[in-house]
From Swiss-Prot:
NCBIfam families: thiE
Binding positions for Mg(2+) per the UniProt entry: D74, D93
Cofactor binding, note field: Binds 1 Mg(2+) ion per subunit.
Entry GO terms, CC: cytoplasm
A family per Pfam: TMP-TENI
Family affiliation: Belongs to the thiamine-phosphate synthase family.
Protein name: Thiamine-phosphate synthase
Transmembrane residue ranges: none
Binding site for 2-[(2R,5Z)-2-carboxy-4-methylthiazol-5(2H)-ylidene]ethyl phosphate: T137, L138, S139, G169, I189, S190
Gene assigned in the entry: thiE
Top-level enzyme category: transferase
Length: 229
């Protein structure tokens, strides 16, 4: 998996957007340059059954048009039905071992918020981890306590190689700190889905992240030049 996929990672479902606006919000985000999309259709108002499948196919069509990977949150049957690019699992969802057996060659992401969760997870079987919540968030009813940037740094110290995306109460202003903490990108829900102008909000995120990555790469390049003149 190319870790660039995690730079601006949008997570959304119909309950995260104004009624009837979900596909419009998604397309605006795709047009503005998100690097990955996770379809997370949950909650009492979320679609189920045939309606959810139909929407997932529409989502997949849009993601394919913009050449952006589509990850399905937790729903194994849906991910298999549409042959999604991957699946994202929480700590209480299907085991990673089973998921890898069901989805050979697909992208598997895992939510990891603490050292204990990291140590108890088969990290070698996942392609990336979603770490957080960094800050308190209203987007998930069952969100764990916030870990802060320090928590993000601690998770990165446990494994310097695993691709990691930060999530939880984040916005464009956090791009620099997220990268400094060791994450490869930023995952958002409401920063885009609740924005008055989803395209503009996404563009600010994308441009901010790209500018920071460019700056970080330049700093690393200068270090190498000084080390090997």
């Amino acid at each position: 998996m190319n870790r660039k996929m995690l730079q601006v990672y949008f997570i959304c479902g119909t309950s995260d957007c104004p009624k009837g606006k979900f596909l419009d919000v998604l397309e605006k985000a795709l047009q503005a340059g998100i690097t990955c999309f996770q379809f997370r259709e949950k909650g009492e108002q979320g679609l189920t059954g045939a309606d959810k499948l139909l929407l997932a196919k529409q989502v997949q069509h849009l993601c394919h048009r913009y050449q952006v990977p589509l990850i399905i949150n937790d729903d194994v049957e849906l991910a298999r039905a549409i042959d999604a690019d991957g699946i994202h699992l929480g700590q209480e969802d299907l085991s990673v071992v089973e998921a890898r057996q069901l989805f050979p060659g697909k992208i598997i992401g895992l939510s990891v918020g603490t050292k204990e969760e990291y140590l108890n997870s088969p990290i070698d079987l996942v392609d990336y981890i979603g770490s957080g919540p960094v800050f308190p968030t209203l987007s998930k009813d069952d969100a764990s306590p916030a870990i802060g940037m320090d928590g993000l740094k601690q998770l990165r110290k446990l494994n310097s190689d695993i691709p990691m995306v930060a999530i939880g109460g984040l916005s464009a202003k956090d791009c620099k700190e997220v990268l400094q903490a060791g994450a490869d990108g930023i995952a958002v829900i409401s920063a885009i889905s609740h924005a008055e102008d989803p395209y503009k909000a996404t563009k600010i995120l994308v441009d901010g992240m790209q500018a920071m990555i460019l700056k970080f790469n330049q700093v690393e390049s200068n270090k190498q030049i000084l080390k090997n003149p």
